[in-house]
Amino acid sequence: MIDPRRLRILRAAADHRTVTAAAAALYLTPSAVSQQLAALEQETGHTLLTRSGRGVRLTAAGEILLEHANAMLAQLERAEAELAAYAGGSAGEVTVAAFATGIAEVLAPAIVTLGVRRPGVRVRVRDAEGDASLPMVLDGEADVALAVEYRGAPREGDRRLVRVPLYAEPFDAVLHAGHPLAAEPEVALLSLADSDWIGPYPGNPCLDMVLLACELAGFDPRLRHSSDDFRAVVALAGAGAGVALVPRSALRGMEVRDVVVRPVTGPAAFRRVFAAVRRGAEDHPLIRPVLDALGDAAAGLSTREG
């Protein structure tokens, strides 16, 4: 009988591509991971991993086993959910990994809702920017991920996860108060073609989305300054260093000086926010209320955004 715990370790090794990284994700030592993988190979009678440079990759046998492992682990998630429901599991902790703006916009309101609706459900929050939240869910470090997908940089579907769409939000133009277009009620993206731009660093999907929107508008933005921190981007715009596109929710509650924020016309720049859980866990009696509360908070946000 194959030990499911070893299948989780195999999946982590395949995802992270090094034993050291897999061990860190699972809070194990590299030697413990190596021992468990060796035991799994002995159980199956096949070599499952092979060295590839400084990392590891699955063999053909490993690929076959991983496909079945994903299905098996999803079924175990369903079994745990049904057992928890049978036992009347109405109290417990759910760990949610989320990006900062998502915490402020939907997770914090969801926690308030849960405090009234399901006081037995305790939410533990982990700040996870960029792509970090989804691997945390897959590795079992978190139960729910709150993540984003940008236009121009769609995420590949992962059958191990169930995604729950929450809301889409536009990016607004941030201009210095003295910019020639500052008095306009809205700004055509093409009209910013001659401005200096402030944007994220290469590799940030937000930058890919900005570049695509500008390309569709008919120009390549002249990127002069780079920061992945929206507060820094807005501060630079306030200093007259350039213009930027910033998610609307990131601007809410932010202290802005010497800048104006305007809706953009032309090719749309937007991002989609979604929750994700391990397949089979979506109806767990502790996780389902969290997803429902996130959905309620997002519906209110969509109303405000119009």
Show where each model-derived region lies.
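Short helix-boundary/capping micro-motifs
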Residues: R11-T29, S34
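A short LG(V/I)-centered, amphipathic sequence patch enriched
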Residues: V19, E41-L58, E63
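Central regulatory/effector-binding core of bacterial HTH transcription factors
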Residues: A91-P154
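Hydrophobic hinge/microswitch elements
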Residues: G102, E129-A142, V148, Y201-V260
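A late-sequence structural motif
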Residues: V106, V259-R304
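Secondary-structure junction motif
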Residues: V148, L181, P185, S195-A217, ...
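Beta-alpha-beta core module
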Residues: R155-P165, E169, R231-G280
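Flexible hinge/capping segments at coil-to-helix
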Residues: G157-F171, L175-W197
